[in-house]
Swiss-Prot record:
Comment text on domains: Possesses an unusual extended V-shaped dimeric structure with each monomer consisting of three distinct domains arranged along a curved 'spinal' alpha-helix. The N-terminal catalytic domain specifically recognizes the glutamate moiety of the substrate. The second domain is the NADPH-binding domain, and the third C-terminal domain is responsible for dimerization.
InterPro entries registered for this protein in UniProt: 4pyrrol_synth_GluRdtase, 4pyrrol_synth_GluRdtase_dimer, 4pyrrol_synth_GluRdtase_N, GluRdtase_CS, GluRdtase_dimer_dom_sf, GluRdtase_N_sf, NAD(P)-bd_dom_sf, Shikm_DH/Glu-tRNA_Rdtase
Catalytic activity from the UniProt record: (S)-4-amino-5-oxopentanoate + tRNA(Glu) + NADP(+) = L-glutamyl-tRNA(Glu) + NADPH + H(+)
Protein name listed in UniProt: Glutamyl-tRNA reductase
The protein's assembly and partners: Homodimer.
Gene: hemA
Enzyme class: oxidoreductase
Coiled-coil zones: none
Record: residues binding substrate: 49-52, 109, 114-116, 120
GO biological process, one term: protoporphyrinogen IX biosynthetic process from glutamate
Length: 457
């Protein structure tokens, strides 16, 4: 058994190629089911976002797994393999696990440490569970990756430092004013940067937002998204008198807010502090405005310094997470090693309980007049004896599973307790339940296909 990651992402694949391999929400579950029906594919989860399309699969053989995943992509999207193979990035076993942990923590994201991808990984996993394309291995691996993603963000605070200009502006406003809920925020300009600033402002709790723009049609369109008010640019002096914060990104060729305009505004404000953020290039605001009392002006260069410092903080946090990822991989591989012992322990318990049940039947034949209470007491105590006798052998079996010669040790364990047939039955039951293990032929010697085929180097 092996774990594969096959896919495209923003690092290696241009958007004009990525967009051809994006699974729609409506088709994603059908795609996972279709993939699982391919030869060699035992479990699968597909993560499809604007920045990546990645297939994670448990396969019985690496070369056939790679082949059938490529063939699936070709068939599903109607594109010849030769046209996209150069863009595909494939990682195996430890590399695939590491990549998933990096994705879930935001280390592989365009914006280092962003949290949106963790929700997307979780949703992909839930989608796969709903259509039964995961089994024993991915149920454990994805739960671990999602839990680790949450823990990594909590322990390192990697996502707490703004690394975009518009978000840095909002963070700076929060440092100056604290709670933004009661503050009046004006957005000058209804372009892309203005909309992003409005989104971040609203996400930080601001409820009173005014969009100011030359073209009212564009302003109205943006305002609808954020339940904001709209004013034309000729009302800018009035808005400046009322607002606590102004974020400007008009794209104008010349200064929009002059020092002279602000001097008049400040007389009307009667000393109330005004926070101005100019993220436009060329600048919208006269730099001389910063000379005015109780006016705090920041331009894109000021914010870039904040972003650079924050990005460095995120990089330091990322280094800590990289070390934690190594520990997570070790933890998962240790779990994999114990997986092979489950059918052995189950078989041993089943044989012991069968003996206990036969013993109870023998007692009842020899002592037919047992009361219900006596029968319950005997049943309870004979099971207690079984559990006490099995405690040490079960512990030993688990220890065997963690050793390099696990398969030989477990086979010896099986022979000693005479549970060969019971183990075969447990392996078949396990395979049917999880649809992960290869079919076990009744005449074949019992084996532990999961633990030995995953690379442990």
């Amino acid at each position: 058994m092996h774990i594969l990651k096959v896919g495209f992402n923003y690092k290696t694949t241009p958007v004009d190629i990525r967009e051809k391999f994006t699974f729609s929400e409506d088709s994603l579950q059908d795609a996972m089911v279709e993939l699982k029906n391919q030869k060699s594919i035992l479990e699968d989860v597909i993560i499809s976002t604007c920045n990546r399309t990645e297939i994670y699969a448990v396969v019985d053989q690496l070369h056939t797994g790679r082949y059938y995943i490529k063939q699936f992509l070709s068939n599903w999207f109607g594109i010849e393999k030769e046209e996209f193979s150069t863009y595909l990035r494939i990682t195996e076993d430890d590399g695939a696990m590491e990549h998933l942990f990096r994705v879930s923590t935001g280390l592989d994201s365009m914006v280092l440490g962003e949290t949106q991808i963790l929700g997307q990984v979780k949703q992909a996993f839930l989608n796969s569970q709903q259509v039964n394309t995961t089994g024993t291995i991915f149920n454990e691996l994805f739960k671990q990756a999602i839990t680790f993603g949450k823990r990594a963000h909590k322990e390192t605070a990697i996502g707490e430092h703004a690394v975009s200009i518009s978000y840095a502006a909002v963070e700076l406003a929060k440092k100056i004013f604290g709670d933004l809920q009661e503050k009046h925020v004006a957005i000058l300009g209804a372009g892309k940067m203005g909309e992003l600033a409005a989104k971040n402002i609203q996400g930080s709790g601001a409820t009173k937002i005014t969009v100011v723009n030359r073209t009212l049609e564009n302003a109205n369109e943006m305002a609808e998204k954020f339940n904001a008010d709209v004013e034309s640019i000729d009302q800018l002096p009035v808005i400046l008198q009322q607002a606590d914060i102004l974020i400007s990104s008009t794209g104008a060729d010349s200064i929009v807010v002059t020092k002279e305009m602000m001097e008049k505004v400040q007389k009307q404000r009667k000393g109330r502090a005004l926070f101005l953020v100019d993220i436009a290039v060329p600048r919208d605001m006269d730099p001389a405005i910063s000379e005015l009392e109780n006016v705090f002006l920041y331009d894109i260069d000021n914010l870039q310094h904040i972003v650079d410092d924050n990005l460095e903080s995120r990089k330091q946090a990322a280094e800590k997470i990289e070390l934690l990822i190594e520990e997570e991989i070790v933890t998962f591989k240790e779990w994999l090693k114990t997986l092979g012992v489950i059918p052995v322990i189950s078989a041993l318990r089943q044989k012991a309980l069968t003996i206990q049940a036969e013993t109870m039947q023998s007692i009842e034949r020899k002592i037919p007049n047992l009361t219900d209470r006596e029968r319950k007491v005997l049943n309870k105590h004979t099971k207690s004896i079984i559990n006490q006798l099995l405690k040490e052998p079960v512990t030993q079996a688990k220890e065997f599973a963690g050793k390099d010669n696990a398969e030989d040790s477990l086979q010896l364990f099986i022979n000693i307790f005479g549970i060969e047939e019971e183990v075969k039955e447990e392996l078949v039951k396990h395979a049917k339940k999880n649809e992960t293990l290869m079919k076990i032929a009744k005449e074949e010697p019992s084996s532990f296909p999961i633990i030995e085929k995953i690379t442990t180097a």
